[in-house]
A protein has these predicted regions:
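Membrane-protein biogenesis/insertion across secretory and organellar systems
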Residues: 1-371, 375
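Juxtamembrane interface at the cytosolic side of transmembrane helices
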Residues: 375-388
Length: 388
């Protein structure tokens, strides 16, 4: 019995020390944005580009007429894969709806899970493009059109184009049939006689409406699961920022890597930019409605006549399945919150996935993981039995 108590005490000290270590946050001399060295001759935007202040972000989402225009589906391009369908509003090239074909709303339900849903109470959408600092545009008059669609290297490419004020905009959306993300390349060609200054941006909008809020029950995990933004940046692998926190203060952080995501219980949407480029990751609440914007803004860039600027990203919209998330980004699976026992949860999930691939049944996977844990803990159990 004494040996068992000794082992238990040692184990408790180790666990306590571990949590003390991961919670310790040493002073960071280079924590401020101004102190980060930037290997680029092009400066970042001196004055913060605020989502609410830029042209693509100043739409009043409480304006019913504006939302009805999107819901009328007069200018919608629909993309299809075996896994999902995706609706693009050609006015802005905005993703306004995604339907996940393999996930019913409820068991035995014919209705399918809708993630992006600008016309629903969530006001959930994704937009990307360029913000111009010395040129005003009117996107309501110039819509994108489908220039071409083709297949190459098992990927489907859809090319959207529009011209406005001597600027040629192009949005190339590519995807594979077995992925839950699309690759998006936004580009603009300056065909005017003068230089233009711009910055790329990408953002996800969503209200704080929780569709599971009316189903509060200990038997419905979705009713009390986290709903809100999460980021990965150069300084933090996983940073949850709740809607309540954003109601009090905005989030801004300079980073050359990472992603911005919007989480719910079983599903996630995320923006994954190319690494190695300076971005300011942002999140804020609209001053006009209960809509929160998360995303990123890139460096300012001056484009000479007949020159082009481009911006590459991936947009994920699908289930929290590790192998699917890692297709979009090797560390996007960190968005799956295992809680404070993640160091136990992650290997257990990996073991369950391994056994599921062998048996094709989650029930047997749980049984086999239980047996595996019993085998691994047998030496400790044997010691405790001897000292009883």
């Amino acid at each position: 019995m004494e040996n068992f108590q000794r082992y238990f005490l040692m184990f408790s000290i180790l666990i306590f020390s571990y949590f003390l270590l991961i919670r310790w946050d040493p002073p960071n001399e280079n924590s401020s944005e101004n102190s980060i060295s930037i290997d680029s001759e092009r400066p970042l935007i001196n004055d913060p580009i605020d989502f609410e202040e830029t042209a693509p972000f100043n739409e009043n989402l409480s304006n019913i007429k504006a939302i009805d225009n999107v819901c009328a589906a007069n200018n919608i391009k629909t993309l299809e894969s075996p896994y999902w369908s995706l609706d693009i509003d050609l006015k802005k090239g905005e993703i306004v709806k995604t339907t996940l074909k393999n996930y019913p709303v409820e068991i035995d339900s014919k209705g399918k899970k809708i993630l992006f849903n600008k016309c629903g109470p969530e006001k959930y959408s994704h937009t990307s493009g360029f913000e111009f600092l010395n040129k005003e545009l009117n996107p309501d008059k110039n819509f994108f059109s489908v220039k071409e669609t083709y297949t190459s290297d098992n990927k489907i490419f859809v090319v959207l184009e529009k011209t406005e004020k001597n600027l040629l905009f192009k949005k190339i959306i590519s995807y594979k049939n077995d992925d839950y993300f699309v690759s998006v390349t936004d580009s603009v060609l300056n065909v005017s006689a003068s230089e233009v200054t711009l910055a790329p941006f990408s953002k996800i909008d969503r209200s704080s409406v929780d569709l599971n809020a009316d189903e509060n029950s200990i038997f419905n995990p979705a009713s009390f699961a986290y709903l809100g933004p999460a980021f990965q940046t150069s300084s933090d692998n996983y940073n949850k920022i709740s809607f309540s926190d954003l109601s009090e203060d905005n989030f801004r952080e300079l980073s050359t890597k990472g992603w911005a995501s919007m989480l719910e219980h079983y599903f996630i949407s995320a923006i994954v930019p190319e690494e190695g480029t300076n971005f300011i990751f942002q999140a804020r609440k609209s001053t006009k409605s209960d809509v929160f914007s998360i995303g990123l803004v890139g460096e300012t860039n001056s484009i000479a006549p007949n020159r082009e600027a481009s911006f590459n990203q991936k947009v994920y919209f699908g289930p929290k399945i590790k192998k699917e998330l890692q297709k979009a980004h090797p560390e996007l699976d960190l968005a799956v919150d295992y809680g404070w026992l993640w160091w136990i949860g992650q290997p257990m999930y990996s073991a369950m996935s391994f056994f599921h691939n062998l048996t094709g049944n989650w029930g047997w996977s749980i049984v086999l993981v239980t047996i595996l844990i019993k085998v691994l803990l047998w030496p400790l159990s044997m010691v405790s039995y001897r000292n009883m």
